[in-house]
């Protein structure tokens, strides 16, 4: 049993490419448990260049309230951070019984790092695969400019059955994780038991 005294739980370690250093650097994917209000501090400190900063804070508050009232919340908030603790990517999802549904994904828009969104999604996919009941990895509402990323880079497919934009099954998720590990020249290593 892992016990964490911080405000976030490490999920995976991985690598992303630093365009300034021209090399791969270590990164860690975290999940915020929203057990106390200190969890909001890092997100509040983000600059206003983050499109989904307020939505992330709102979802954290919803999860905090649910936790406080003893209700199991499906909201899942993930971040990808470099070794200095700088947030490079954010993802808000719903961790449902049979699906992991990504509501929005965003990476820092400074152009310094490559593979942030892909690595964050692959880390979340790896977390999803641990739940044997979850069958599909879903992008619920992708913005038009992100379709190339989700379809061509990650391998999600257009959906006509579920009420969502893009979908990937378990086999596709395994392939996507493998492809991401090859691109980033590093395994995505589980930290959460």
Enumerate the language-model features and the residues they cover.
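Non-catalytic substrate-recognition and accessory regions of acyl/acetyltransferase enzymes
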Residues: 1-112, 123-138, 147-148, 152-193
């Amino acid at each position: 049993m892992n016990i964490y005294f911080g405000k976030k739980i490490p999920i995976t370690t991985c690598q992303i490419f630093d365009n300034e250093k021209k090399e791969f650097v270590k990164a860690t994917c975290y999940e915020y448990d929203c057990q106390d209000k200190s969890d909001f501090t890092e997100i509040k400190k983000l600059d206003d260049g983050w499109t989904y900063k307020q939505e992330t804070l709102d979802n954290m508050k919803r999860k905090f309230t649910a936790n406080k009232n003893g209700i199991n919340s499906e909201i899942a908030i993930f971040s990808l951070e470099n070794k200095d603790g700088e947030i490079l990517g954010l993802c808000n999802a719903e961790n449902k019984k049979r699906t992991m549904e990504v509501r929005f994904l965003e990476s820092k828009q400074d152009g310094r790092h490559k593979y942030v969104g892909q690595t964050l999604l692959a880390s979340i996919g790896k977390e999803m695969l641990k739940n044997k009941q979850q069958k599909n990895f879903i992008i619920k509402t992708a913005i038009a400019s992100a379709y190339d990323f989700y379809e061509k880079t990650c391998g999600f497919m257009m959906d006509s059955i579920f009420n969502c934009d893009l979908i990937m099954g378990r086999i596709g998720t395994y392939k996507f994780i493998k492809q991401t590990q090859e691109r980033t020249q590093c395994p995505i290593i589980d930290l959460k038991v």
